[in-house]
Amino acid sequence: MRPPWYPLHTPSLASPLLFLLLSLLGGGARAEGREDPQLLVRVRGGQLRGIRLKAPGGPVSAFLGIPFAEPPVGSRRFMPPEPKRPWSGILDATTFQNVCYQYVDTLYPGFEGTEMWNPNRELSEDCLYLNVWTPYPRPTSPTPVLIWIYGGGFYSGASSLDVYDGRFLAQVEGTVLVSMNYRVGTFGFLALPGSREAPGNVGLLDQRLALQWVQENIAAFGGDPMSVTLFGESAGAASVGMHILSLPSRSLFHRAVLQSGTPNGPWATVSAGEARRRATLLARLVGCPPGGAGGNDTELISCLRTRPAQDLVDHEWHVLPQESIFRFSFVPVVDGDFLSDTPDALINTGDFQDLQVLVGVVKDEGSYFLVYGVPGFSKDNESLISRAQFLAGVRIGVPQASDLAAEAVVLHYTDWLHPEDPAHLRDAMSAVVGDHNVVCPVAQLAGRLAAQGARVYAYIFEHRASTLTWPLWMGVPHGYEIEFIFGLPLDPSLNYTVEERIFAQRLMQYWTNFARTGDPNDPRDSKSPRWPPYTTAAQQYVSLNLKPLEVRRGLRAQTCAFWNRFLPKLLSATDTLDEAERQWKAEFHRWSSYMVHWKNQFDHYSKQERCSDL
């Protein structure tokens, strides 16, 4: 997904040949030896020099790698960010800076479907930089601002990825676009709640500091600090939701877009106790003393600060409590500070009268995750699984489920006319993971926000890109609407179809209309189908594909009633069972499985008998 005219592809930007190339492309920061005033901006920290970039419709200005915090290294590891001190002279902001230290996906080396999400700059703990794209020349009147927060399970991600290129939205829609790096994994979310040395949620605090920077400085770029929209996908969307729920963040933005993620998802937060368990286990794994009641938190964190960054990353995944997918080791913690209560409680009691929110999902939210640990799944075959593999997959996909709850999931998702059909079992496994982690939390959030006064719009994205390299059985996977929202199909070198280019332009208009007015519809367009608000009564949402908008009702309503209403009650009930009753139910479960096995064997025997009679 890297256009050949992309002038910031590699860190080696100092070569004379590259500067010559940039000059030929019209991308240099200077013209005939003079500074281009459009590329010089003064912010509170000092002066910046940006770069002019080409986009298919004309040039844009980009200011890349702007420091907004002091490097969180040494004694600042695990600590809240500190604002960047002023600098002297003109700071070069013509190239992306380091990516925050993180896990790198090596499951399919060289495969574009995984490599596109891997870091494309040097890994470093010195990584708190942000980027600004504006139309060229800069807007003369205040322009709405879009702030992107990347996803990656809170363990990975970078604002410099090619799929997050802000030039298209800036050039085509005339907006100001901002993205930032924030700390992930151990460095952003390791927590010993109550301690000063590692309070937790510092990755979210990185994001908040970037939002504060935007409020203080974006007017210098032509942006309107009074019209700021947050948008993010997956963990980025969950982050957006947490800023909605965190009072100190609420004054820093005005609208929010949550793509395929929510703060109330089962993977998005952990309790203070679980966060401490994971932190102390990581410490033990890397040879540091325990903290808490059995030790000293200060000693534990002091020791962890001496460990190489890669050593911490290498041990991150070993702290999860059970085998699972769509669960991540270090995530936001309910700390009583950034999150004063659980997301569910804050959503239920919040006042959202002044909020406009756009939320949605893609068609096949679960498929991407199956190749990362569910038995029988691979990108290199059709992943036609057996019933035994499906049953094992349910335990991995819903790791918190009791035996009875897992049986309920199996019951709900089995096609009882064809209970052994491999293709159905594959698709059912994808639906289990997607519904549980994304679709039904999104539906729940949309309903609760709408009930409490927010203006909500909802969608399902259904188009599979013609350039997608993942296998057909994956459908429209998690994350693959992003390239259309950012307008990548407008670049002819990327080989999208004409229809996809038109589709991308339509989506860009919906998102920027929402950023301007809180409504994705164009007030000047009376002919196109209207996108209605989502209400608790009508539950209307739209399908986004190559066809005109289609309005539907009830986003997987029956299935989400199972996840959002029935299953929590079942889990609560089974939590109160005494041990004898638990054992009885476990025996009953084994007996049921035995009877199913006996019936299958009997049916097989009966068929053989009939065949022998012929």
UniProtKB/Swiss-Prot annotation:
InterPro entries: AB_hydrolase_fold, AChE-related_enzymes, AChE_tetra, CarbesteraseB, Carboxylesterase_B_AS, Carboxylesterase_B_CS, Cholinesterase. It comes from the Eukaryota. Keywords: Cell membrane, Disulfide bond, Glycoprotein, GPI-anchor, Hydrolase, Lipoprotein, Membrane, Neurotransmitter degradation, Secreted, Serine esterase, Signal, Synapse. Its EC number is 3.1.1.7. It is a peripheral membrane protein. Disulfide bonds join 100-127, 288-303, 440-560. It is found in: Synapse; Secreted; Cell membrane. The active site is at 234 (acyl-ester intermediate), 365 (charge relay system), 478 (charge relay system). GO terms for molecular function: acetylcholine binding; acetylcholinesterase activity; cholinesterase activity; collagen binding; hydrolase activity; identical protein binding; laminin binding; protein homodimerization activity. It is an enzyme of class 3 (hydrolase). Glycans are attached at residues 296, 381, 495. Has been found in central nervous system and muscle. Found in embryonic liver and spleen but not in adult liver. PROSITE patterns: CARBOXYLESTERASE_B_1, CARBOXYLESTERASE_B_2. The keyword Magnesium does not apply. GO terms for biological process: acetylcholine catabolic process; acetylcholine metabolic process; acetylcholine receptor signaling pathway; brain development; cell adhesion; choline metabolic process; osteoblast development; positive regulation of axonogenesis. One of its GO terms (cellular component) is nuclear envelope. Homotetramer; composed of disulfide-linked homodimers. Catalytic forms H (GPI-anchor dimer) and T (asymmetric collagen-tailed), which differ in their C-terminus, account for all types of known ACHE forms. Interacts with PRIMA1. The interaction with PRIMA1 is required to anchor it to the basal lamina of cells and organize into tetramers. Belongs to the type-B carboxylesterase/lipase family. This is Acetylcholinesterase. It comes from Rattus norvegicus. The lineage of its organism: Eukaryota, Metazoa, Chordata, Craniata, Vertebrata. The gene is Ache.
